[in-house]
């Protein structure tokens, strides 16, 4: 019975595809960081004084975030051919959006005190940027980088559906030939790989930034803290090490000897930080060199880029048909409906997945594990399974997207609940309130603004994700998008991409306006 779920391909083929998927995610994340961090800093008001430069940088960040990675992959496959290169570029450019936005927010929220002290010493602009700004942002940048790597590894298998390399190519083959048992087997493999990556990411995050304490009865075990524990706050380990490199808590030498040292001592923390950095550097080199990325394809594809953009640009409005308009309405409706369904189940479930409101440790662990497993399955894969089970259509796409959004938003809600202040809860408890009354009265009012903000962000993500579900029969604009790409209707393809960008951008503007009015 279980043999039906084992892929028929050779083990080496599956292994190579899985490694290619990891290389796409890792190198793509690095590419996004290389471009996203400078763009994010240029978008910050307290760093870049020139408004035109800020506006240009923000425009690139918004475009990268508003355009789905699958759309980028579709275009790059046409430019560079089927393979890892298209997926790497798609992941990288789409990552710029999230990384750039979060870097901008982090830069604008830094403490101005250290920066003023650095400027008072007569430091130049670059010295101010590194010592006064960057040293405060390092913990946040590490958290953003690791979280983005997790997201990219979850989305990388989807890109193979349009030929962008990795294990998604095998998924597309199974779905096209109706081999759903083997498709489910590959899906389970993807979930296992994502879980492993999340564990490694959590290990790295805790090693660099430290851990947070949970509020569960009893002392959580090491694996509980590592695998299911609370969120990591921007910690002090890296920041303190950067700001005060000469500190050596474990050295036996006297303070006078340390102060006379011209180089920072090799403490355990410094060795750990440099070792992790070296490992990531080696992985980056491997991710670029091991996959079959021919330099000639990069050169040839880049030369075609201007003409390809010109072909994507519509000359008139003939592409804007009634079918396209109705499919865009369906896409928006799928996004709204999936958001509503996800929130309906996520709000109560998040209290079970938060360490300070869960009825017990066992329920907390089970809730966190379930949330992790749901979050690990890409929405497009869930849509394929639902299409096979109940048939194609918008209802199928809505249910599939709701499941994916549930795992995403529940984690954000649970993390916000764990940040609730204990004092207010103690006051409610002193009146004799039970656990439910305490959660509703002492916790929910505290986290309501965060929940509203996260819900609006969820709607933004859901609208963006709903645009690709039609590729596998989940309803919406995705079918026309894929059809235009296959038939080489480039003006129609460009028009659809433009519509997707406008809709997602408008939703983001409206959500930002609502967030500012409510919060």
Which residues fall in each region the model found?
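Cytoplasmic-entry segments and transmembrane alpha-helices of multi-pass inner-membrane transporters
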Residues: 39-73, 102, 349-383
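Hydrophobic positions within alpha-helical transmembrane segments of bacterial inner-membrane proteins
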Residues: 25, 29-37, 41, 45, ...
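Alpha-helical membrane-interface segments at transmembrane helix boundaries
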Residues: 15-23, 57-64, 150, 325-333, ...
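Hydrophobic alpha-helical transmembrane segments of polytopic membrane proteins
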Residues: 167-204, 477-513
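Short hydrophobic, aromatic-rich alpha-helical segments embedded in or entering the lipid bilayer
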Residues: 1, 163-173, 300-308, 473-483
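Generic hydrophobic transmembrane alpha-helix motif, especially the helices
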Residues: 61-95, 371-404
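Membrane-cytosol interface at the C-terminal ends of specific transmembrane alpha-helices
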Residues: 82-148, 199, 392-443, 449-461, ...
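N-terminal, non-cleaved signal-anchor transmembrane helix
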Residues: 1-26, 30, 201-340, 347, ...
């Amino acid at each position: 019975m279980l043999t039906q779920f084992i892929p028929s391909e050779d083990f080496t083929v599956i292994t190579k595809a899985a490694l290619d998927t990891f290389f796409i995610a890792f190198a793509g994340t690095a590419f996004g960081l290389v471009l996203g961090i400078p763009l994010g800093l240029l978008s910050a008001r307290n760093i870049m004084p020139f408004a035109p430069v800020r506006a240009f940088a923000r425009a690139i960040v918004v475009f990268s975030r508003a355009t789905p990675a699958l759309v980028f992959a579709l275009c790059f496959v046409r430019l560079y051919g089927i393979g890892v290169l298209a997926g790497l570029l798609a992941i990288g450019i789409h990552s710029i959006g999230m990384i750039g936005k979060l870097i901008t927010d982090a830069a604008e929220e830094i403490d101005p005190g250290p920066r003023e002290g650095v400027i008072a010493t007569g430091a130049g602009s670059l010295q101010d940027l590194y010592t006064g700004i960057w040293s405060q942002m390092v913990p946040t940048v590490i958290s953003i980088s690791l979280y983005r790597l997790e997201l990219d590894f979850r989305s990388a298998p989807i890109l193979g559906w349009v030929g962008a390399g990795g294990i998604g190519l095998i998924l597309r083959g199974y779905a096209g030939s109706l081999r759903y048992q083997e498709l489910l087997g590959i899906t389970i493999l993807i979930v296992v790989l994502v879980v492993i990556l999340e564990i490694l990411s959590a290990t790295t995050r805790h090693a660099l930034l430290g851990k947070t304490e949970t509020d569960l009865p009893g002392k959580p075990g090491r694996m509980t803290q590592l695998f299911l524990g609370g969120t990591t706050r921007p910690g002090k380990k890296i920041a303190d090490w950067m700001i005060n490199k000469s500190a050596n808590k474990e050295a036996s030498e006297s303070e006078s000897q340390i102060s006379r040292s011209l180089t920072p001592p090799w403490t355990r923390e410094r060795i750990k930080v440099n070792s992790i950095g070296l490992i990531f550097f080696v992985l980056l080199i491997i991710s670029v060199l091991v996959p079959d990325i021919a330099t000639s394809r990069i050169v040839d594809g880049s030369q075609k880029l201007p003409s390809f953009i010109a072909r994507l640009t519509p000359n008139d409005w003939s592409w804007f048909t009634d079918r396209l308009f109705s499919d865009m309405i369906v896409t928006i409706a799928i996004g709204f409906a999936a958001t509503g369904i996800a929130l309906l189940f996520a709000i109560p479930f998040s209290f079970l997945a938060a360490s300070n409101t869960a009825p017990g440790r066992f329920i907390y662990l089970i809730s966190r594990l379930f949330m992790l497993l749901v979050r690990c399955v890409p929405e497009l894969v869930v849509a394929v399974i639902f299409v096979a089970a109940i048939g194609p259509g918008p209802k199928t796409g809505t249910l599939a997207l709701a499941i994916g959004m549930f795992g995403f938003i529940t984690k954000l809600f649970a993390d916000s609940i764990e940040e609730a202040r204990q004092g207010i809860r103690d006051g409610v408890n002193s009146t004799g309130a039970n656990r439910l009354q305490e959660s509703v009265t002492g916790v929910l009012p505290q986290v309501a603004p965060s929940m509203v903000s996260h819900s609006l962000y969820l709607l933004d993500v859901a609208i963006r994700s709903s645009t690709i579900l039609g590729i596998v029969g989940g309803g919406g604009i995705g079918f026309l998008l894929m059809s235009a790409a296959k038939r080489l209707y480039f003006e129609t393809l460009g028009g659809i991409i433009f519509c997707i960008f406008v809709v997602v951008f408008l939703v983001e503007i409206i959500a930002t306006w609502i967030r500012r009015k409510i919060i």
